[in-house]
Amino acid sequence: MEVLSIAIVSFSFLLFLFFILRDSRPKNLPPGPRPSPIVGNLLQLGDKPHAEFAKLAQKYGELFSLKLGSQTVVVASSPAAAAEILKTHDKILSGRYVFQSFRVKEHVENSIVWSECNDNWKLLRKVCRTELFTPKMIESQSEIREAKAREMVKFLRGKEGEVVKIVEVVFGTLVNIFGNLIFSKDVFDLEDPTGGSVELKEHLWKLLDMGNSTNPADYFPIMGKLDLFGQRRAVAEVLQQIYDVWGVMLKERRGTKGSESKNDFVDVLLNAGLDDQKINALLMELFGAGTETSASTIEWAITELTKKPLVVSKIRLELVNVVGDNTVKESDLPHLPYLQAFVKETLRLHPPTPLLLPRRALETCTVMNYTIPKECQIMVNAWAIGRDPKTWDDPLNFKPERFLSSDVDYKGNDFELIPFGGGRRICPGLPLASQFSNLIVATLVQNFEWSLPQGMSTSELSMDEKFGLTLQKDPPLLIVLKARASNI
């Protein structure tokens, strides 16, 4: 009898919730699939929402809506729809939907990624735009990135003939690049995985993995404050562990303030008068977003090259013509148009953040003659846009040549190619990310040949994706490297 009573009460509550949600559905939304009671369209997502959204766009149009649990979501899937979201209505749609696991108050309030576009956010963006990522600052630190690329080559030469998970090596290299840009020191030892600040790398990996896990509260926000699954608490603990690692370095630098400047990011942030909470949040996002997205892009690039030996030959020939037998440097990159076209093509098919980061409508507005209600969540499917046959000729064919005769770029003005977003929320580290990808790909192609392990053919190489905050290759790429006797 008690079980029956509980069942009746539970069913009554769900039925009540269903009618509340049904009656509160906004009018004149973009078209979309009919939602099921309670769960909405959640069961249609699968493990690759970006691909499922692309299929829904083919049926319902470039701007469609759906219900994910109790959340109303609108998805843009064409350059025109993306321009409406990221440019025409950029201001009113600039709110950020913060994933429930990452709603750690001290971090969100000081975050350049998750906070609202308030005065604090504007200050952090200004510091990035006018201090950290200026052409002058980036150029002044090119020798650091080149030195770390050479160290990567030295490490990989020592692994010749062994099976290497290339994304881990690239990730470690990028962590050290950021360590030197920010603190003027390595934080990870490629030669000794147990040495250096290995815990920082491990904490970053752990945090990024948490970002790829599902939290039911994202679909039923009423559960959010309860943190029933402990995911927010776990994120807060890892964030604190990361802050503790570089807290010692920050304290040391504050103690020596006024002595000889190291001209690194910490100097800039301290001179800007930022407190530790702001610095912690900004450094977290530089390390986290800057390393993972670039590492993913480079892994996809090497995967495509593994399947396309002719493309490898073209990049290598261009390197010979421009660089000769010298080591490739960042100053060479503007003179390597085919390499740049190759990286663009990689980003077209494998955008690091396939749905960008979700936005939120600050007020009700009209987009493409449809109503976008206040608090609605908005996603832009950069993955689908990059594969849109109405925009790209033969879109599923990997063809860098398409960019040699095109002015389309990924700097936020061409909505056909938006791997880093656009509008006021565009990734502030875009100029640096571009340097990373081009330099490391060029360095690997110049110094190594590689093959798949155990005689695997390229036709057996999986191109499957693992969806998350970043679009990872699944499984990770394993290769066997062979050092080239000459750069020519």
UniProtKB/Swiss-Prot annotation:
- What family is this? Belongs to the cytochrome P450 family.
What organism is the protein native to?
A: Coptis japonica (Japanese goldthread)
Name recorded for this polypeptide: Probable (S)-N-methylcoclaurine 3'-hydroxylase isozyme 2
Task: Specify the pathway.
Answer: Alkaloid biosynthesis; (S)-reticuline biosynthesis; (S)-reticuline from (S)-norcoclaurine: step 3/4
State the GO CC annotations: endoplasmic reticulum membrane
Q: Which domain of life is it from?
A: Eukaryota
GO BP terms = secondary metabolite biosynthetic process
PROSITE patterns attached to this UniProt entry: CYTOCHROME_P450
Q: Which SUPFAM superfamilies match?
A: Cytochrome P450 (SSF48264)
Describe the function of this protein: 3'-hydroxylation of (S)-N-methylcoclaurine.
Instruction: Supply the gene name.
Output: CYP80B2
Q: For this UniProt entry, which segments traverse the membrane? A: 2-21
Location relative to the cell:
Endoplasmic reticulum membrane; Microsome membrane
